[in-house]
UniProtKB/Swiss-Prot annotation:
It comes from the Eukaryota. The keyword Lipid metabolism does not apply. Its main location: membrane. Keywords: Cell membrane, Disulfide bond, G-protein coupled receptor, Glycoprotein, Lipoprotein, Membrane, Palmitate, Receptor, Transducer, Transmembrane, Transmembrane helix. The gene is ADORA1. The keyword Membrane applies. It comes from Bos taurus (Bovine). It is found in: Cell membrane. Glycans are attached at N148, N159. A lipid is attached at C309 (S-palmitoyl cysteine). Signal peptide: none annotated. This is Adenosine receptor A1. Residues 1-10, 70-80, 147-176, 260-267 are extracellular. SMART domains: 7TM_GPCR_Srsx.
């Protein structure tokens, strides 16, 4: 007999479904926009597509699995472990995509004349592939043995049971907090976030330095170029800020759970942290729509062409790759 759902669980499920209904169409629209608009085909937007793919998977896969775990079905230990690992893979993929975007922006302002020969679409695809492979390695590490099976088996055998343990499937019952804090957070989340902060600080410094230089007659229009780069850096730094704001609370709660086992953790705080982490997948398309004109124009074109059946002005695909707010 399936477990009954409380009013609190029903509210949780309703909010998760709402997040998924915003996240999946929004990020599919991002991928669609890059596909139909040639002006959104440079390396930066390749990394943005990778980020959008991870966000689509959060809405289409992770949130349904989170709802399933919240209901608390009884499953075999390794079945529950397989349900818990996708969120680790997708979180890591998002972090590495954001890091790749930060490095890309740094190279664009550090070596503007050589940028297109250094950062080619082919190399961007190789970088994205490497990021996903690394994400699977990090996210599937609990499947290789760093999990709570030993502790669960002790309790299982102490009760006189045999075979693989059957448990109430919950994330913290199968995923080791040592893994989440020491390996996942301290190695694969916090250092990349700090590195990205340093990279964007350097990007802003280089841009300000160039903008403060006097413009010579033979220099083309560096003020315009670096002005655009400043706008895109601000937009992408905002994406990074929202990611950190969304995911750090959950990792901080994990640290409290590990280092202070006796500390009482209000359940509502855990739910808020979960909502923030899942809600991040719905934020990026909104930021793109408001801050990147080429995305905004392409979104409207897709809407008019495919949903309103009204022709929209054509997007100039021969125009140079768009910068936010340009």
């Amino acid at each position: 007999m399936p477990p009954s759902i409380s009013a609190f669980q029903a509210a949780y499920i309703g909010i998760e479904v709402l997040i998924a209904l915003v996240s999946v169409p929004g990020n599919v629209l991002v991928i669609w926009a890059v596909k139909v608009n040639q002006a959104l085909r440079d390396a930066t937007f390749c990394f943005i597509v990778s980020l959008a793919v991870a966000d689509v998977a959060v809405g289409a896969l992770v949130i349904p699995l989170a709802i399933l775990i919240n209901i608390g079905p009884r499953t075999y230990f390794h079945t529950c472990l397989k349900v818990a690992c996708p969120v680790l893979i997708l979180t890591q993929s998002s972090i590495l995509a954001l890091l790749a975007i930060a490095v890309d922006r740094y190279l664009r302002v550090k070596i503007p004349l050589r940028y297109k020969t250094v950062v080619t679409p082919r190399r961007a695809v190789v970088a994205i592939t490497g990021c996903w492979i690394l994400s699977f390695v990090v996210g599937l590490t609990p499947m290789f043995g760093w999990n709570n099976l030993s502790a669960v088996e002790r309790d299982w055998l102490a009760n006189g049971s045999v075979g693989e343990p059957v448990i109430e499937c919950q994330f913290e019952k199968v995923i080791s907090m040592e893994y989440m804090v020491y390996f996942n957070f301290f190695v694969w989340v916090l250092p990349p976030l700090l590195l990205m902060v340093l990279i964007y600080m350097e990007v802003f410094y280089l841009i300000r330095k160039q903008l403060n230089k006097k413009v010579s007659a033979s220099s083309g229009d560096p003020q315009k170029y670096y002005g655009k780069e400043l706008k895109i850096a601000k937009s992408l730094a905002l994406i990074l800020f929202l990611f950190a704001l969304s995911w750090l609370p959950l990792h901080i709660l994990n640290c409290i759970t590990l280092f202070c086992p006796s500390c009482h953790m209000p359940r509502i705080l855990i739910y808020i942290a979960i909502f923030l982490s899942h809600g991040n997948s719905a934020m990026n398309p909104i930021v793109y729509a408001f801050r990147i004109q080429k995305f905004r124009v392409t979104f409207l074109k897709i809407w008019n062409d495919h949903f309103r059946c009204q022709p929209a002005p054509p997007v100039d695909e021969d125009a140079p790759a768009e910068r936010p707010d340009d």
